[in-house]
Amino acid sequence: MKVGYLGPAATFTHLAVSSCFQNGAEHVAYRTIPECIDAAVAGEVDFAFVPLENALEGSVNLTIDYLIHEQPLPIVGEMTLPIHQHLLVHPSRENAWKELDKIYSHSHAIAQCHKFLHRHFPSVPYEYANSTGAAAKFVSDHPELNIGVIANDMAASTYELKIVKRDIQDYRDNHTRFVILSPDENISFEVNSKLSSRPKTTLMVMLPQDDQSGALHRVLSAFSWRNLNLSKIESRPTKTGLGHYFFIIDIEKAFDDVLIPGAMQELEALGCKVRLLGAYQSYQL
């Protein structure tokens, strides 16, 4: 089994893949989210594993838009990973980490550790990299430089770096959601037995073109009177002009034979365009 993921190695996406699939799955890194999804469509890999949402930074719009407008792959699973940011240095700098000349990482990682950096390195410049994994590799490859990197445990072990400060992120409850995509919506796969799971269904709903008054209220009512709990509703532009949006709706329930199909039929009767994006298990560490 091959799993494509947003690379490079030792990023949080790679860590999530490794935490989810632990039975000999081959991990294949891709440079971008579209390349990863395209690889699954082309059959190069069995699954595409890409980020969907971060608790602090919000949704990964590229993932959502590519699934809606370019490659409508079904969501067959979801993985939520807690995000722990650490300060790493080359082993030769372990005892002098407080005198770093520069700190490398992805822009999001640096932003998520602002308080720690302001307190301990108020005048040290930052160097932004394409990913935390790429930044860790650079630090590992340049022991002659007095530099550090913000990254995860996997980056430390992969590139033989020392963790000098753990959990330096500003907020302890930061998590990232990743979706598992496959051309085969009925594909089965084994996950780490230590993961907990719950069912989830995700829909795309586009309001009627005539934009009737109260249309969104009627959409929500179709779920409300059926006691279907929505964990998320988010709008995205349809890319057909200002003021035109579709909605991504997460339902905390397995796709059944009555309630969710009934809600979908009611929405279609209202003139909405409705698409099932996936009915799947959501896994958490």
From Swiss-Prot:
Residues 204-281 form the ACT domain. Its EC number is 4.2.1.51. One of its GO terms (molecular function) is prephenate dehydratase activity. Keywords: Amino-acid biosynthesis, Aromatic amino acid biosynthesis, Lyase, Phenylalanine biosynthesis. Residues 2-183 form the Prephenate dehydratase domain. One of its GO terms (cellular component) is cytoplasm. The record marks 176 as: Essential for activity. It is an enzyme of class 4 (lyase). The keyword Iron-sulfur does not apply. The keyword Iron does not apply. It catalyses: prephenate + H(+) = 3-phenylpyruvate + CO2 + H2O. Pathway: Amino-acid biosynthesis; L-phenylalanine biosynthesis; phenylpyruvate from prephenate: step 1/1. One of its GO terms (biological process) is L-phenylalanine biosynthetic process. It holds the Pfam family PDT. This is Prephenate dehydratase.
